[in-house]
Amino acid sequence: MSDTSTVKSQCEDQNIDLIRLLYVTPSGVIQANTVDVSEVDAAVESGVTLSEVIQVYDAFACRNRNSRFDAVGEVHLCPDPETFRPLPYADRAGAMLCNIRTLDGEPWDVDSRSSLQSVERDLRAKGLSPQVAFESEFSLFSRDGDGKINRGDEAGAYRTESIRGTHDAILHIVDALKAQGIDVKKYHPEFSPGKHEIVTGHHTGLEAADEHLLLRETVKSVAEQDGYQATFLPKPFDDGTNGCHINVSLWNGENQFFDPNHGDISETARQFIAGVLDHAPAVLALTAPTVNSYSRLQPRHGAAGYICWGWLNREALIRVPAPAQGREADSTRIEFRGADNTANPYLGLIGLLAAGNDGIERELEPPEPVSVDPCDLTDAQRTAKGIKRLPQTLGEALDALETNEVLREALGPDLFDAYVEVKRNHWKLFTESAGAWQRERLRNLY
């Protein structure tokens, strides 16, 4: 859809009265304003007024009183009509994803969606177009009358028993995603009670990030209608974790990550990997942006505990998956395993793409791939292979981000500073409160 007449026609056909204008702040929490369908022309043409200060609220709706933004200052929330979707889980409602613009109509420097668009434009000018897909993990649970949590099945990953136990809820989620035009590729239960994973198709970075936000909204909304609560929190319980693996390749008519002469990943892919590894501690501040994230990024958690890469290695930060047989040229990609669903997906992709592009521009060579669980190596062996530990707290990751000029330039100084402010406030709240209290609140937010 490219104009408001198409949006209004679809709203009339499907009896839609309310349109949610969705956006996500540096906190990673999805926000919305809602307009009546009669206001859609005005919303697209002129935007909807939004306070600047919303961008520096953290996940708990708190902000630093010495913030760069305060009660004075407004911007415009500008819906993109091409992103319009009816919401099958919300009666007479639709949604559009939004950019944020200044009162003069220019892209606001603190808007993450506009910033990702700029990064992708710069890459396309160099002949590289990203293709991205998210693998989203989440947990379904319910509460009894006393508030006690019931996590459902105990069967484990890939078991048909687990599939049977939540079949109706998952089917309703998949139906709702497909009704919004989201390309669902795979689903399976995962390695802890009530944990599930949905994989969606490859798109441009912007389209993939947009769909990821719609998926998060859909899963939580449909699960609630089926009597569950869904959480994407990285470590919602004492056991089990939820990640968000990000699959990336770069294209220029053909897949630039595939070397047809050797049937292997290309030099471009290796340079991209090297760049991500080089900037990994700082990138993590964008892709694993909550205190809870670092409870997941531990050795032997099937996530990543160390900065390394490897073929088929699920304990490496970057895994090179096996390509589809007979479709190697189309399916060769890398999988970044250090992300989770508390991230603002636009910012996470900016970090990954900027780091990888820096590796290409500097023609970096990655270290040798790691073919074992890095936990099985001795300290001396890891040192010899150049394998370092990932940041173990959000504070450490933010320290790395604040000194990283490549990511500062990619985000732009205003967005960079606003993001650091929000996450420093989040880190400060954690250091002043109990971890169990944090997890309980974050489990509901994400």
From Swiss-Prot:
Induction text: Expression is induced in complex medium (CM) in which putrescine is both nitrogen (N) and carbon (C) source, in defined media (DM) with putrescine as the N source and glucose as the C source, DM with ammonium or nitrate as the N source and glucose as the C source, and in nitrogen starvation media (NS) without the N source and glucose as the C source (at protein level). Not expressed in CM in which yeast extract is both the N and the C source (at protein level).
Cofactor stoichiometry and binding remark: Binds 2 Mg(2+) ions per subunit.
PROSITE patterns named among the record's database cross-references: GS_BETA_GRASP, GS_CATALYTIC
EC assignment: 6.3.1.11
GO molecular function: ATP binding; glutamine synthetase activity; metal ion binding
A GO BP entry: glutamine biosynthetic process
Residues at which L-glutamate binds: R296, R314, R337
Catalyzed chemical reaction(s): putrescine + L-glutamate + ATP = gamma-L-glutamylputrescine + ADP + phosphate + H(+)
Annotated positions binding ATP: S249, R314, R319
Highest taxon listed in the record's lineage: Archaea
Keywords of this entry: ATP-binding, Ligase, Magnesium, Metal-binding, Nucleotide-binding
Biological role: Involved in the breakdown of putrescine via the biosynthesis of gamma-L-glutamylputrescine. Not required for glutamine synthesis. Is not able to compensate for the loss of glutamine synthetase.
NCBIfam families in alphabetical order: GGputSyn
Subunit architecture: Dodecamer.
The name this protein goes by in its record: Gamma-glutamylputrescine synthetase
Originating organism: Haloferax mediterranei (strain ATCC 33500 / DSM 1411 / JCM 8866 / NBRC 14739 / NCIMB 2177 / R-4) (Halobacterium mediterranei)
Gene name, Swiss-Prot/TrEMBL: glnA2
